[in-house]
């Protein structure tokens, strides 16, 4: 926002156009869906001091798959990025990508420092990770719009859905009398975008929609 000498706004532009003001404004079903796909224990209070930037089992599994890939061994590729390191990557790494092991370590260190800036109890920092991720996850680019960032704009651009309506449908405080079919469609669209972020340029293109639908079906049963 640009202000004049009287502090009156003269120009205002918000990008992404649809975003969550804070963690508490995110519908619980959206949070639960993200955690189900990415990290089911991220917001657990069992270990209040946990570092959300590091998931060692996931990290070592990803490292082993990279070794297997280098040796031309068959196997499914696994990613080692936590939500916290993904946010660091989108915001600060060149082109939003990880080009080297050194860059991955830098992301982990940066995300770790950020996780403890509010104190040794990281629950609030972990909530901020979820909030930042949903507001900034890159979801390819669309003709006539440009780059798409965040779940809200993704719903609007890729599914022509009203983000506010989707939020209402998936907020258990507000959806007691909504149509279940409409609610199911909203949840499916949200889950599809959470899956699509792995290869957004492919899954959100016409050629990749069939594969995206198949993966979405495997998560919603």
Q: Each predicted region: which residue ranges?
A:
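Terminal hydrophobic membrane-targeting helix
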Residues: 1-29
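Solvent-exposed coil/turn segments that connect beta secondary-structure elements
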Residues: 5-7, 26-29, 37-40, 92, ...
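Acidic helix-start/capping segments at beta-turn-to-alpha-helix junctions
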Residues: 28, 45-71, 80, 105, ...
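Non-catalytic, structured segments within soluble enzyme domains
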Residues: 75-221
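Hydrophobic/aromatic-rich, well-ordered segments within soluble, folded domains that form packed cores
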Residues: 28-31, 124
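Short beta-strands and strand-coil junctions in structured, solvent-facing domains, enriched
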Residues: 21, 40-44
